[in-house]
Curated annotation (Swiss-Prot):
It comes from the Eukaryota. SUPFAM superfamilies: Family A G protein-coupled receptor-like. It is a multi-pass membrane protein. This is Olfactory receptor 5J2. Gene3D superfamilies: Rhodopsin 7-helix transmembrane proteins. It is found in: Cell membrane. Glycans are attached at residue 5. The keyword Glycoprotein applies. Pfam families: 7tm_4. Belongs to the G-protein coupled receptor 1 family. Odorant receptor. PANTHER family: OLFACTORY RECEPTOR (PTHR48018).
Length: 312
């Protein structure tokens, strides 16, 4: 009996979003369209920035990095989720689950760092424009992006290593559509208090630090914008920052709800809805938010279309 109680789990069953076959078919089509749009738009933005010399600036370099991360972190979840919507019993091996968690964690943490770097870029451009070329040189941009990736990797490795040290016994049904930490911790037969503390400490500190960086940057930007005499100048400054601030608010709002809360306040169904939004919704919305009112991007797209028609 004791041996049966402590059978080692080699795979997890992902319960997903629903058991209804008809709804699964509808969700498959909807999520496939969203994922395809996300990939095409983000990869298209990267290509557009590469081929348009006018967009070879720190701001658009960072935007291309953000687009790459968005494409990656949606790809860490969406393909497996789409496959699971087509099968009766969705399973994932323990090793694949850890890899999925690692990839998703790296990408989403890196995104948080990148958003704070983009806020710093806007801060320097508006508050100290004379120092902009020095503060945001090509080398500095590469260093900031590299640091963002390193931060994402280190943070996620800590959680993944601590997660692998846990024992998973008989229970292996994950009440989620991917290997999310809170859902996995609920299945462990080990003491998970240290994992919860690490999650709250590291992810919480990183989220708060990067979010405060954004907020402080925009406070200085707001004061600097008010000192701009021309109305058009103020409007341009606010317009440039509004899109990024919107993306930041959506991103951190969903993450704080999902991760920075005690397990006693963890509601599975609400978490699934929020997770669906930040795994598929945010990567698609980010690009729309950043490019919707961006004249440079619109002009670059128009020129690219005209060039295509000319070549044809």
């Amino acid at each position: 009996m004791a041996d049966d109680n402590f059978t080692v789990v080699t795979e997890f069953i992902l319960l997903g979003l629903t058991d209804h076959a008809e709804l699964k078919a509808v969700l498959f089509v909807v999520f496939l369209v969203i994922y395809a749009i996300t990939l095409l738009r983000n990869l298209g933005m990267i290509l557009l920035i590469q081929i348009t010399s006018k967009l070879h600036t720190p701001m658009y370099f960072l935007l291309s990095c953000l687009s790459f991360v968005d494409a990656c972190y949606s790809s860490a979840i969406a393909p497996k989720m789409l496959v699971n919507l087509l099968v009766v019993k969705a399973t994932i091996s323990f090793s694949a689950c850890m890899v999925q968690h690692l990839c998703f964690g790296v990408f989403i943490t890196t995104e948080g760092f990148l958003l704070s770097v983009m806020a710093y870029d806007r801060y320097v451009a508006i508050v100290s424009p004379l120092l902009y070329t020095v503060a945001m040189s090509d080398r500095k941009c590469v260093e900031l992006v590299t640091g963002s990736w390193i931060g994402g990797i280190v943070n996620t490795l800590i959680h993944t290593i601590s997660l692998r040290r846990l024992s998973f016994c008989r229970l292996n049904a994950v009440s989620h559509f991917f290997c999310d930490i809170p859902s996995l911790l609920k299945l462990s037969c080990s003491d998970t208090s240290m994992n919860e503390l690490l999650l709250l400490t590291f992810s919480g500190v990183i989220a708060m630090a990067t979010f405060l960086t954004v907020i402080i940057s925009y406070i200085f930007i707001a004061f600097a914008s008010l000192r701009i005499h021309s109305a058009s100048g103020r409007q341009q400054a606010f317009s440039t920052c509004a899109s990024h601030l919107t993306a930041v608010t959506i991103f951190y709002g969903t993450l704080i709800f999902s991760y920075i809360q005690p397990s006693s306040q963890y509601f599975v169904e609400q978490e699934k809805v929020v997770s669906m939004f930040y795994t598929l919704g945010i990567p698609m919305l980010n690009l729309l938010i950043h490019s919707l009112r961006n004249k440079d991007v619109k002009e670059a797209v128009k020129r690219a279309i005209e060039m295509k028609h000319f070549l044809c």
